[in-house]
Amino acid sequence: MTEEDTAAEASQVFTLLQNSPNPFNPSTVIVYKLYRSGFVSFRVYDLLGRLVSVLDEGEKNAGWHEAVWDGRNTSGIPAPSGVYLYRLESGGQAETGKMTLLR
């Protein structure tokens, strides 16, 4: 690890990786690393900004974590094929990624 890497980590709360597989059916995994413990909100939205699913919400320890989306909405109903946004928020930092569900 270089000094630049260490400085970047000091200013970051987390690193969010691309989901895998993508496109996916029936489920996908999204990996993220928290550089320090804290509250996490991890949600899935459709392209109109409507909440589809809550993947994780609550206090998490520093380290690597996995969130799994099974392609279902908050009511347990399978979401239709399409592009969805996953958004991780923690410690004042927020990042969004895109994923494609194919039915």
Language model feature labels by segment:
Residues T2-E4, E59-A62, I77-R103:
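C-terminal tail/sorting-segment detector
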Residues M1-S20, F24-Y45, V54, W69:
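Glycine-centered coil/turn sites that cap beta-strands in beta-rich domains
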Residues A67-A79:
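Signal that preferentially marks extracellular ectodomain short beta-strand elements
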Residues V52-S53, A79:
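Generic structural signal for well-ordered beta-strand positions
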Residues N25, R36-G38, N61, N73-S75, ...:
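Residues that cap or initiate secondary-structure elements
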Residues S27-V29, F39, W64-E66, V83, ...:
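Intrinsic-disorder/low-complexity, polar/charged segments enriched in Ser/Thr/Lys/Arg/Asp/Glu/Gln
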